Amino acid sequence: TSKAPQKQDASNPKKGLKNFLISAQEKEEWTRLMLAIQKSADAVENLLDDGISPNLRGRESFQGYTPLIFASEIGSLETVKLLIERGARINDSDSEGRTALFHASENGHSKIISLLVKNGANPNAVSVQNRTPLMQATVNQHLEGMEILLKNGANVDHQNHFGLTALMLGAQNGDLDSVKKLLLHGAEINTASKNGFTALFMAVQNGHGKLVSLFARFGGEVNQKEKETLRTPLIVAAMEGHTPVVELLLSLKADPSEYDGSGMIPLQGALRSKQFETAELLIKGGSPVNHQDHRGQNVLHDATVAGNLGLVKMILEKNADSSSKNQRGETPLMLAASEGHLEIAQLLLRSGASRLIKDRFGRTAWMHAIDGGNVELVKLLAKGGYPASEKLIFAASRGHTEAVEIMLNLNADPDSRDERQWNALMWAAKNGHTATVQLLLKTGLDINSMGSKNWTPLMLAAGGG
């Protein structure tokens, strides 16, 4: 039996050569046309008369440009007119989905924008990133181009892939004139992006006070929360340290007690970002001082950690609780001790802060001072509170030789024992604190004394216990 005839291979050499020659010809024609567009409309006309297509596609670095797109981008008005007359497709786009109108709008070529829309260019054609010509004109502050687009049907509230509108993009840039134009053309003021940011948020984040004021006059919501962190404009402004914007928002009735998803209020945001001028304004503006976030941290805790004595004083004068605890059981005094803030610790003690409170891990403020390594704070907190012998054992276990010496000078019994019947020497030996061991031996402690399980300091130093 005879076999059926084989189909010719689609990738045969003759066809491949033909495709290559066509491709090479188009590339050569595009190069000639591109050079002509940069030269003059007459030069372009000569090539079109020679049969080169007005809808030829650019290759490689020209990302699928058409002659009309390229002429619109560089602002060659006469060439744009010619190409339209010779049949150029007005709404063709490049490989990024950008039309001739998109490129003209991006570069502020107003006369070309006007010509294109009169000849049917779609003002709402979107790029692959879902951006419109109006967005590009706004970003680049091309007011005349914006006006033409808006009068010819551009959607003022179109949102890109991130949910941003032209109004938001103008707000990001702080461009008052562009924003005014968009608002006068009916831009929706409280539209939110995918993460919940409005145009007012954008203005606040970048410290554009005049825009914030303008948005408020047009009905911008000053207490609206964004979606991810649930922060308000006031929290964002406080964290960024935009004090004039914070003052403005307060005058517009922004709520200083509104908190974000972590329970943080604007004042805490300012303190944690060390925006002290802003924090002072918020305190004077009536911010609550005893509010706790979801970790139990309050304003006094935050001001203490930030190390600002003046703000701690202001907060205490507002009747903040000097012995308040966070979820870890830490008081402001403990945090001052940990962070090495001596003057703040002194102020807290004068305001009635207790030395006796222990955190969830059984540590007092003095123990926090030991771990923080600040000798002056160790001295300050050494007197009062728990027995000196208990403090001596803790200091020895941490190897804080100066603290051990301080407690010995306060008549702590060097041979006092804890619940395991271990003394300070045993703890220092177990943890390898040689200098502390040497100091304690000078007190006459017996190196062969035993604790629980009959462990001696020497055994503990060798790895026992």
Where are these regions (language model features)?
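Start-of-repeat signature of ankyrin repeats
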Residues: E29, S61-G64, G97, N130, ...
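Intrinsically disordered, low-complexity regulatory segments in ankyrin-centric signaling systems
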Residues: S2-D50, S389-S397
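Ankyrin repeat structural motif
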Residues: S40-L48, S76-I84, H109-V117, H142-L150, ...
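Ankyrin repeat A-helix N-terminal signature
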Residues: L35-S40, F70-S76, H103-H109, Q136-H142, ...
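Core solenoid repeat modules with strong leucine/isoleucine-rich periodicity
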Residues: K194-F197, Q205-N206, E228-R231, I235-E240, ...
